[in-house]
């Protein structure tokens, strides 16, 4: 299987690559359109700001390529948020607009922001992505922005407010948490994604 991790210059590439090695795969890290277009599965990890990530994708001519992708692609943390229509960061940053839902800064409800640490996910709809994962398994989060619960939400998390922890739209999958830092449940989710 040809697995490519898209290099946005603002992500935790090595930890994602290490997790995929543990699952018996040898992924390629690349920002080249010709390499990315040959992938069987794609990962779009991201850490940092939407504006920085979008600038990098634009600079590398990857925006249209990702928008038109027909292979399964998993956005991680900021990578998932980039699938949204616009981020409220810095008075508005246009993102990939794959799902027509905005990304908004989380509201303070007595919990510290950013949301950083372990939290559970709920699974309101049965889905193959969660095979072998128990209701209320813990996953590792580190974010201040989120996608509200919407039509593409397949799992949600409560942190003073409900937000999408996993989304799916066509071949686009997104996780707000970091599966590569989430122990066995995170590894199982990635394994399920790779078996699509």
Curated annotation (Swiss-Prot):
HAMAP family, sorted? HisH
The pathway noted for it is: Amino-acid biosynthesis; L-histidine biosynthesis; L-histidine from 5-phospho-alpha-D-ribose 1-diphosphate: step 5/9
Q: Where is it localised?
A: Cytoplasm
Reaction equations catalysed? 5-[(5-phospho-1-deoxy-D-ribulos-1-ylimino)methylamino]-1-(5-phospho-beta-D-ribosyl)imidazole-4-carboxamide + L-glutamine = D-erythro-1-(imidazol-4-yl)glycerol 3-phosphate + 5-amino-1-(5-phospho-beta-D-ribosyl)imidazole-4-carboxamide + L-glutamate + H(+); L-glutamine + H2O = L-glutamate + NH4(+)
GO MF terms held by the record: glutaminase activity; imidazoleglycerol-phosphate synthase activity; lyase activity
Task of the protein: IGPS catalyzes the conversion of PRFAR and glutamine to IGP, AICAR and glutamate. The HisH subunit catalyzes the hydrolysis of glutamine to glutamate and ammonia as part of the synthesis of IGP and AICAR. The resulting ammonia molecule is channeled to the active site of HisF.
Q: Which Gene3D superfamilies match?
A: 3.40.50.880
Query: Which EC number(s) does the record attach to this protein?
Result: 4.3.2.10, 3.5.1.2
Q: Which organism is it from?
A: Blochmanniella pennsylvanica (strain BPEN)
Residues forming the Glutamine amidotransferase type-1 domain are 2-196
Biological process per Gene Ontology, one example term: L-histidine biosynthetic process
Signal peptide location in the record?
none
Which Gene Ontology CC terms are recorded?
cytoplasm
Q: List the Pfam families.
A: GATase (PF00117)
| Primary location class | cytoplasm
NCBIfam families, alphabetized: IMP_synth_hisH (TIGR01855)
The subunit structure is: Heterodimer of HisH and HisF.
Give the positions the UniProt entry annotates as the active site: 77 (nucleophile), 178, 180
- InterPro entries recorded: Class_I_gatase-like (IPR029062), GATASE (IPR017926), Imidazole-glycPsynth_HisH (IPR010139)
Q: Kindly state which keywords UniProt assigns to this record, in alphabetical order.
A: Amino-acid biosynthesis, Cytoplasm, Glutamine amidotransferase, Histidine biosynthesis, Hydrolase, Lyase
Q: Which PROSITE patterns match?
A: GATASE_TYPE_1
Q: What is this protein called?
A: Imidazole glycerol phosphate synthase subunit HisH
């Amino acid at each position: 299987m040809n697995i490519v991790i898209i290099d946005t210059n603002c992500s935790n590439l090595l930890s994602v690559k290490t997790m995929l090695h543990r699952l018996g795969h040898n992924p390629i890290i690349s920002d080249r359109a010709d390499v990315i277009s040959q992938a069987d599965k794609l990962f779009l990890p991201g850490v940092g700001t939407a504006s920085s990530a979008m600038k990098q994708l634009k600079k590398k001519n990857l925006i249209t390529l990702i928008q038109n992708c027909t292979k399964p692609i998993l956005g991680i943390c900021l990578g998932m948020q980039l699938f949204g229509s616009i981020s409220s960061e810095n008075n508005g940053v246009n993102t990939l607009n794959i799902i027509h839902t905005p990304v908004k800064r989380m509201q303070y409800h007595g919990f510290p922001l950013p949301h950083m640490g372990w939290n559970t996910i709920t699974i309101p709809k049965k889905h193959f992505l969660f095979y072998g994962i128990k209701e209320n398994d813990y996953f590792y989060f580190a974010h201040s922005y989120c996608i509200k619960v919407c039509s593409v939400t397949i799992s949600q998390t409560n942190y003073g407010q409900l937000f999408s922890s996993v989304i799916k739209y066509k071949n686009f999958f997104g996780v707000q948490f970091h599966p590569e830092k989430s122990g066995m449940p995170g590894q199982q989710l990635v394994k399920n994604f790779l078996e699509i």
